[in-house]
Amino acid sequence: MGSEAAAARPVVVTVNGERYEAVGVDPSTTLLEFLRTRTPVRGPKLGCGEGGCGACVVVVSKYDAVADEVTEFSASSCLTLLGSLHHCAVTTSEGIGNSRDGFHAVQRRLSGFHASQCGFCTPGMCMSIYSALAKADRCSSRPSPPPGFSKLTAAEAEKAVSGNLCRCTGYRPIVDACKSFAADVDLEDLGLNAFWKKGADDERADVGKLPAYSGGAAVCTFPEFLKSEIRSSMGQANGGAPAVAVTGDGWFHPKSVEEFHRLFDSNLFDERSVKIVASNTGSGVYKDQDLHDKYINISQILELSAINRSSKGVEIGAVVSISKAIEILSDGGAVFRKIADHLSKVASSFVQNTATIGGNIIMAQRLSFPSDIATVLLAAGSTVTIQVAAKRMCITLEEFLKQPPCDSRTLLVSISIPDWGSDDGITFESFRAAPRPLGNAVSYVNSAFLARSSVDGSSGSHLIEDVCLAFGAFGAEHAIRAREVEEFLKGKLVSAPVILEAVRLLKGVVSPAEGTTHPEYRVSLAVSYLFRFLTSLANGLDEPENANVPNGSCTNGTANGSANSSPEKHSNVDSSDLPIKSRQEMVFSDEYKPVGKPIEKTGAELQASGEAVYVDDIPAPKDCLYGAFIYSTHPHAHIKDINFRSSLASQKVITVITAKDIPTGGENIGSCFPMLGDEALFVHPVSEFAGQNIGVVIAETQKYAYMAAKQAVIEYSTENLQPPILTIEDAVQHNSYFPVPPFLAPTPIGDFNQAMSEADHKIIDGEVKLESQYYFYMETQTALAIPDEDNCITLYVSAQLPEITQNTVARCLGIPYHNVRIITRRVGGGFGGKAMKAIHVAAACAVAAFKLRRPVRMYLDRKTDMIMAGGRHPMKVKYSVGFKSDGKITGLHFDLGMNGGISPDCSPVLPVAIVGALKKYNWGALSFDIKVCKTNVSSKSAMRAPGDAQGSFIAEAIVEHIASTLSVDTNAIRRKNLHDFESLKVFYGNSAGDPSTYSLVTIFDKLASSPEYQQRAAMVEHFNAGNRWKKRGISCVPITYDVRLRPTPGKVSIMNDGSIAVEVGGVEIGQGLWTKVKQMTAFALGQLCDDGGEGLIDKVRVIQADTLSMIQGGFTGGSTTSETSCEAVRKSCAALVERLKPIKEKAGTPPWKSLIAQASMASVKLTEHAYWTPDPTFTSYLNYGAAISEVEVDVLTGETTILRSDLVYDCGQSLNPAVDLGQVEGAFVQGIGFFTNEEYTTNSDGLVINDGTWTYKIPTVDTIPKQFNVELINSARDHKRVLSSKASGEPPLLLASSVHCAMREAIRAARKEFAGAGGSPLTFQMDVPATMPIVKELCGLDVVERYLESFAAKA
């Protein structure tokens, strides 16, 4: 290699204390890929590949032999490259605790606080918490905590998981588990857990009852032998080392800037084949579409990691991590501290720990990355030092950003930030607007302002002497300074006319490029931030009494309440920094014990340790191949040819599986909903939607398959094809619909025309729209197909429909059903997305494995999954409604179009669900025309509460429209039109059940008519009167949800040692199915035991779903699978009890194990299979609930903070209150995402473009209600239901519309404040989702200008 580089040596790392040499590893290998393919570790998961979800978080430890110090930090293993980790130690969730060595306190507490459902996110969650604990405990300046606690504060505990995504739990129990370690927490405030019984007089919260925590030192993250090896290698290096160290194949580690440049001069590579890396976090934003041959690791160049402080300021080396920069700047002056505060909201902690300051700025300069850091440092007057070859120069950051994009030879050495000291004349503020307050989201706009000013003695306002105004992320190539505005402001005394003119000038400066999303909103944000800044320098602007104009650094939802507000209203605090509080109320029953007990979810500790096995955790069989979809990007076109952009990609491809590879006698079928229709597996011969599967690339590794699929070049032709139908409007124009079978069609009620004739008031052609929602299960679609003898095949699939998957795969291959075996142990989140859509992956794997006669595995990358998934149905509704002057509704008619996509899937089922949820109110007469539109987009499918979520919201939109028209309180309209039992029976028929079970009126009155609600509503009104730029709203929403009971099988087998194996048709997808089934098994067999069966729970194992073992398994969905599975198991147990009773009676009261031994000796059959079917007269029932939500809207930015949500849900006699509580909270938060911030966007061809964690934002810990209260009530007994229980999985999602309704009330208050904001101040259409841009638009994009104009006019 020449004198510039040594011979390559293998990368040496330790994983959980075990030493590994990475020999023959591709240089582009990530740590996650290495862990999952070269070690036994399976805890870290691939959730996104972007550093945006936290599923892959590990702890990395580095040893400084000179200082004899170990530093450790959390990191995203999906982004961290293995080649950069030579002589590092890696600790995963298995490494801190496991089933053999004992679980760690973090793992046990996550389990005990019921904080793990599907469990796919839990190992990463575990490591984020562990890392935060270890970091706090290492801080010597903090006081020692009481025994059992850590040095972590409760606020830090919450933020520890702010970058980790969870789609199941709603975060509240995770936050409680985190806070249980904090010394400043009140344990009584923590939620339901397995360690003490809340509210019990004899069971007080006590740290001694929690799993013991003794500090981070209990886990050795860096083994001594590796320290010795490092010291030894240093000794060898001192004896004469080559200029540049080399590890692996193609990794170079220069130690100086000179060595870096000599590498380029040595002709070892060309610039196009080399990648410069320090942390590689940028690849989460800009995914490499090809692999690089060479990598230069600049993180070991000492000069680039130096930090120099002086009286002039601080110079930060380019490879200093963001977290280190925050630490350094936090210890400086006022400007430095505000910069640090802003930086703390950039990315998650596990990205901040590795991402570098220089890397962020380089991305802004080269790739137009919307950097917060560049904007803030630009405003602070920063300079950068760069070096090209032998030439080093220091230029302003502004100059650097304006230069042509840097090439690979240009090295950013450092960034210098001047020290502005403690001059009272200096004001520095920074702002950002993003969907997540704590930062795990790119800004819509970021800005930073620095002014030198003096106070004018006569007016009290500031005279601006000099000013810097920086704006970024608004749609320009890079952050800019608003020079024209700066020049205008210099020498001006800040006043309303001056601010108004500055704002007008700014609108000509901040100009988003064509194609930028929400351009008007971004300009309005920039105006709002300049207004906030300048208002802080002004005096005498007319404000309401007690008003507070929000200003300050990083105002993500900054809220200042009225001074007269009560503490419960959180007055005078920043609402984004409020601690999350909660309350849970429920009734526990011993009647059917252990059924009804809030026991921990089965397998939760295994999930936390990473030992729970998902499909992609199954070890790859010998000769396994890997697949990735090539999908169409055109909605309607002939596929002419498939090629690959690079020769490397084509070299890695073994074959491409297409429709021609389906076996003779097989069908091109990817999914099939019984009696409704099929969907093709492969394009043949015409692509019918963007995202359709053209073929499957097969390669030797999953990475090569991904790479080749991304490099695929498709030749299209649209000759002789009609233009695509993409929208509901297109479908209506072309009369393109799917039929709804008569047996699925909902039934109208009454005479609408007669009802309208009786109305005092009418609304004609009201309209509302609802967009789609992506499932965002943490585990993407995955399958492993293993061919077997005699044309048989076994597939491990993450599926909610194993039986239908088996049938479809068999049809696709042209073989009998019994030749196909589908095995599903657990699913990493489903929500309906692992129903029909999972079948495509299974069938594609099966075709490939069948043809190649080798195992084939597929694990979809997040982008492909999002593009192909389909998601929730978009809908457009027009309605006409008549009502009396007192608010009583006489009749409703609505026309609804839903976008079903290219195939029926489950779409024809949705009309009855839409109408079912909408019928929660007595509409008098109800008629409708529902069209299921056939379009050239991916098929929409069932997503949690399909149709019901939309139908319930449509009802609320109509009711709010009525209330607005009559100028009355919306709750009065709601209450007046709730059913009595007679009308309920008319609208719902047999589902209404008995009068005693109708609890909705009681629930609604409990909330909406309570004195507390009236007081809170008055306080909201008081707050709004005293605050111009913050408005609050409060709303109470009732729900009704009709669920269906389905036949379900169950099998119970008692082993000779007394252990019990149980099989059910349902699949464990995180909903607690296994836990409830175990409880039911113990209860049903309990009459054979002295303790009533409680001792049997630990003897029960529920085993994986297997279609050859458990036929007629049905499907997991519709919220009732758990209860019907329990009933099937109870039926099986009843037969076993009858057989065992004679043995028990003959032997007296033998212990369980002895009883089974005697039965076995007597040849008693110890297994029983049952197939439970519901009573034909009771196949469905209604679920009821209500929720009050209170929100605060920032009129200037559109940001919404959910201050409080109170949920009351009728759970019947809960089979497991802890599981049901988790379902209620998780569904509610998923609903918050649907109604407020999950923006599902497509391009002009219908291709999904919000296709990753960077652009699609599900709720996070910082976006859930600050006060989150849930009460589960037990309604009247109904023994027609399973032990009087009720469903909990889907209905509570509908309650989240209360947040949307509260937002509407807050916006209405803003529109009253600024009358005439684009129309009537009271009546307006607010579609779903109500994202920040939508909220701001409804509040008024020009409220600042209109306010200033009105103020100036008064003056």
Swiss-Prot record:
- Mind listing the GO molecular function terms for this protein? 2 iron, 2 sulfur cluster binding; aldehyde oxidase activity; FAD binding; iron ion binding; oxidoreductase activity
User: What SMART domains does the entry give?
Assistant: Ald_Xan_dh_C, CO_deh_flav_C
Q: What class of enzyme is it?
A: oxidoreductase
E.C. numbers? 1.2.3.1
Please list the residue ranges annotated as the FAD-binding PCMH-type domain.
244-422
Q: What does the record give as the reaction this protein catalyses?
A: an aldehyde + O2 + H2O = a carboxylate + H2O2 + H(+)
Q: Which residues form the 2Fe-2S ferredoxin-type domain?
A: 9-96
The cofactor binding remark recorded in the entry reads:
Binds 2 [2Fe-2S] clusters.
Region (Disordered) residue ranges read: 544-577
Q: Which GO terms describe its biological process?
A: abscisic acid biosynthetic process; auxin biosynthetic process
Q: Which cofactor does it need?
A: [2Fe-2S] cluster; FAD; Mo-molybdopterin
Per UniProt, [2Fe-2S] cluster binds at 48, 53, 56, 78
- Out of the domains of life, which is the source? Eukaryota
What InterPro entries does the annotation carry? 2Fe-2S-bd, 2Fe-2S-bd_dom_sf, 2Fe-2S_ferredoxin-like_sf, 2Fe-2S_ferredoxin-type, 2Fe2S_fd_BS, Ald_Oxase/Xan_DH_a/b, Ald_Oxase/Xan_DH_a/b_sf, Ald_Oxase/xanthine_DH-like
Q: Which UniProt keywords apply?
A: 2Fe-2S, Abscisic acid biosynthesis, Auxin biosynthesis, FAD, Flavoprotein, Iron, Iron-sulfur, Metal-binding, Molybdenum, NAD, Oxidoreductase
List where Polar residues composition bias occurs: 548-566
Provide the assembly information.
Aldehyde oxidases (AO) are homodimers and heterodimers of AO subunits.
State the family it belongs to: Belongs to the xanthine dehydrogenase family.
| Protein name per the record | Probable aldehyde oxidase 2
Species whose genome carries this gene: Oryza sativa subsp. japonica
